[in-house]
């Protein structure tokens, strides 16, 4: 493959855009550097770049594009919105319709509010939790990403449960000190944190299925015990389902495990490819939000007709019979095929998968928390990424990210991908 036009465009971008990209995850820093590939169009499960190279896409825009690129039902809804006005600044019937769809799909949502991104949604749930409880501290789990706002850009210290330290320049230490970080799936560390700071904790922020250091499920009973301990301490449980809502089932991850949080933040898939965020939960908590309560949240673009129309159309596609069963079937075959190729070529990997999302980790035997994911072989992944790119397989350029299947992937795509994995592993095996 040649990437001449991508390389030229990246040099041009570096003159105008900070780092040449509008989100750091799009750079190839974690996979050896160089110019990222510039895509020109997408259709179904495929991308074509500016050099006319074709790819099977497993990035899915980091998760939102579960129905594939340019899905006709969603495209029609967006086109209609474009001709009737994309932004009014007034309430619309689409907001009512979409809110009702979300409530019917996720029973814990007694009231809903739309905004414009997952970051905004999580940020506001924290504000609401603090308003409701009168407390300030938040507990999060190490390695779980909840957006780029100050309150959650923190990392763990050296102990099993520690006050946070800033994970980004520009985040005040005073802000980070209100965030307590504990390892995911470690209920004893969580108990220790509550024992030490419980009367100061407003809420715990949980990815019920981790999506930001790969796909990692909770241990059996972990979420239930977190709920029980949190409520006993007088704090709230917030689920960050920005990645997980409508990814594994028609609804949310909380329904898979039979646990209800007090509030839920959403984004990505529910926008049908357009910018969106939403949060919701118990009525008495949500009524802390203005104009009913003292917790302020607003947005010029919130609930705009284009995003509402795209979101409604996306959920209509996902509600069709057999969607998630097919994603699971294809995901299982892809997982099995990758593991078969690894055994054949002597490549040490483990694969975490749920339904149509999976992560391939190099050089490790299991991944149940961030420390284990962090210990996986980044150099091996970088080599694998570059080889797969040249095989026409588009993956996220990070060892921590997931492969996302869409409703448009076919059996032939999976088999072609497994073959590409085999050729890539064969090349990697030469240097073992």
Curated annotation (Swiss-Prot):
Q: Name one GO molecular function term.
A: glutamate-1-semialdehyde 2,1-aminomutase activity
State the needed cofactors, names only: pyridoxal 5'-phosphate
> Which pathway is it part of?
Porphyrin-containing compound metabolism; protoporphyrin-IX biosynthesis; 5-aminolevulinate from L-glutamyl-tRNA(Glu): step 2/2
Kindly list the GO CC terms recorded for this protein: cytoplasm
Q: Which Gene3D superfamilies match?
A: Aspartate Aminotransferase, domain 1, Type I PLP-dependent aspartate aminotransferase-like (Major domain)
One GO biological process this protein is involved in is: protoporphyrinogen IX biosynthetic process
Name the domain of life: Bacteria
Q: What is its EC number?
A: 5.4.3.8
Q: Which family does the similarity line name?
A: Belongs to the class-III pyridoxal-phosphate-dependent aminotransferase family. HemL subfamily.
Q: Which NCBIfam families match?
A: hemL, PRK00062.1, PRK12389.1
What does the subunit section of this Swiss-Prot or TrEMBL entry state? Homodimer.
- What is the protein name stated in its UniProt record? Glutamate-1-semialdehyde 2,1-aminomutase 1
Q: Which organism is it from?
A: Oceanobacillus iheyensis (strain DSM 14371 / CIP 107618 / JCM 11309 / KCTC 3954 / HTE831)
Instruction: Point out the gene that encodes the protein.
Output: hemL1
């Amino acid at each position: 493959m040649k990437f001449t036009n991508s390389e030229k465009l990246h040099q041009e971008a570096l003159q105008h855009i900070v780092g040449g990209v509008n989100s750091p995850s799009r750079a190839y820093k974690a996979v050896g550097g160089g110019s990222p590939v510039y895509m020109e169009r997408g259709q179904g499960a495929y991308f074509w770049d500016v050099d006319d190279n074709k790819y099977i896409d497993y990035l899915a825009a980091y998760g939102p594009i579960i129905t594939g690129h340019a899905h006709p039902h969603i495209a029609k809804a967006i086109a209609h919105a474009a001709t009737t006005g994309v932004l009014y600044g007034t309430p619309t019937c689409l907001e009512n319709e979409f809110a009702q769809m979300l409530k019917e799909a996720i029973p814990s949502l007694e009231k809903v509010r739309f905004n414009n991104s997952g970051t905004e949604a999580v940020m506001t749930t924290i504000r609401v939790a603090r308003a409701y409880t009168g407390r300030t501290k938040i507990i999060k789990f190490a390695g779980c990403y909840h957006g780029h706002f100050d309150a959650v850009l923190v990392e763990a210290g050296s102990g099993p449960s520690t006050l946070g330290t800033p994970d980004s320049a520009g985040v005040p230490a005073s802000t980070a000190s209100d965030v307590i970080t504990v390892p995911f799936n470690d209920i004893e560390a969580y108990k220790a944190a509550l024992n030490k700071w419980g009367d100061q904790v407003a809420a715990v922020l949980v990815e019920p299925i981790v999506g930001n250091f790969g796909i990692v499920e909770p241990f059996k009973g972990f979420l239930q015990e977190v709920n029980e301990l949190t409520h006993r301490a007088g704090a709230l449980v917030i689920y960050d389902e920005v990645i997980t809502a409508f990814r594994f089932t028609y609804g949310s991850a909380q329904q898979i495990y039979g646990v209800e949080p007090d509030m839920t933040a959403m984004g990505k898939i529910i926008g049908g490819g357009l910018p969106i965020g939403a949060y919701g939960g118990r009525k008495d908590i949500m009524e802390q939000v203005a104009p009913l309560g003292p917790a302020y949240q607003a947005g010029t673009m919130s609930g705009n007709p284009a995003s509402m129309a795209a979101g409604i159309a996306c959920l209509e596609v996902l509600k069709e019979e057999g969607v998630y069963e097919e994603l699971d079937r294809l995901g299982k075959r892809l997982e099995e095929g990758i593991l078969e190729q690894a055994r054949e070529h002597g490549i040490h990997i483990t694969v975490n998968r749920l339904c149509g999302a999976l992560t391939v980790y190099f050089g490790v035997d299991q991944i149940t928390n961030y420390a284990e994911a962090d210990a996986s072989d980044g150099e091996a992944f970088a080599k694998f990424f570059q080889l797969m790119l040249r095989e026409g397989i588009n993956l996220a350029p990070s060892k921590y990210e997931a492969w996302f299947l869409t409703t448009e992937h076919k059996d032939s795509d999976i088999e072609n991908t497994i073959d590409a994995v085999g050729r890539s592993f064969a090349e990697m095996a030469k240097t073992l």
